Amino acid sequence: MLELHDCDATLLNDMQQIKTIMCEAACKAKAMIVTEHFHYFLPFGVSGVVIIQESHLTIHTWPEHGYAAIDVFTCNSKLALQAAVQYITQQFNAGNVTQHYLHRG
């Protein structure tokens, strides 16, 4: 789980760019994308999911707070999750990043 603070509000409100970043992050992890869906909220904010064969990546943004909450979840320990996390944090250029790791199962 990632919490990104102090991000650019314009980027956090750009559904197409967020979709591109999240799908590319799945590819960087060497995951197989099954489908994706993103939604833009008025007046601002984006939520989205990239369903991968191995589980999912999700994002919820609050541009008015410069904040994004992101989950990178997988049931395949062979995926390159750290590559996905690094890519996401670089693309959003957050001033403050908090990572939480949760082992399930």
Curated annotation (Swiss-Prot):
GO BP term (any one) = spermidine biosynthetic process
Q: Where does the source fall among the domains of life?
A: Bacteria
Co-factor binding comment? Binds 1 pyruvoyl group covalently per subunit.
The EC number of this protein is 4.1.1.50
Active-site feature positions:
S55 (schiff-base intermediate with substrate), H60 (proton acceptor), C75 (proton donor)
The similarity comment for this entry is: Belongs to the prokaryotic AdoMetDC family. Type 1 subfamily.
Query: What protein name is recorded for this chain?
Result: S-adenosylmethionine decarboxylase proenzyme 1
Natural source organism: Halalkalibacterium halodurans (strain ATCC BAA-125 / DSM 18197 / FERM 7344 / JCM 9153 / C-125) (Bacillus halodurans)
